[in-house]
Amino acid sequence: MAASRRTAEGNGIRYGVFTAIPMIVYTIVAALAGFLGKIEAGSLNVVIIITGVVLAIRNLRTVKGHHLGYLQGFGTGIITGLVASVLLGATFWLLGGIDQAAVAQVKARDLFGSDLGILISGLGIILVGTMTSVITSLIAMQYYRTPDESQSEVEDVD
């Protein structure tokens, strides 16, 4: 009964936390192993966000009995990516506060000072994760939207 009343926002927060957990574990492992500075290492986090967004939209559609409005699915996908990205960014800031050497791998140039470099990097993580979730939600909702919901068409009014 409670599952049928699940909201898009609650589903997004729930799946955002579920998505953040493997991203945080992977980031900590990458920092400890010394390959956090490789650009390719960050691409796995993008794949994890894409997977989390699609699973969140799919779950909400299943819970709603395959009657999912476009904006509900779009919203749950964005919230999923935003929550996961904020948690990953906070983990990055915490990691930077605990172990400067681990985060130093990421800095190409220290243009704004060491503290601001960590701050900007965390904000960049949030921005990239959120924009990835927006694009993924747009694409996924073309597949998961309700079948009777047609594309908006321009109608001639005579």
Residue ranges of each PLM-predicted region?
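Membrane-water interface at transmembrane helix exits
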Residues: 26, 30-34, 57-61, 88-96, ...
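Hydrophobic alpha-helical membrane-insertion segments
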Residues: 76-94
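Transmembrane alpha-helical insertion/packing segments
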Residues: 1-63
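Internal alpha-helical transmembrane segments of multi-pass membrane proteins, especially GPCRs
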Residues: 13-17, 75, 79, 119
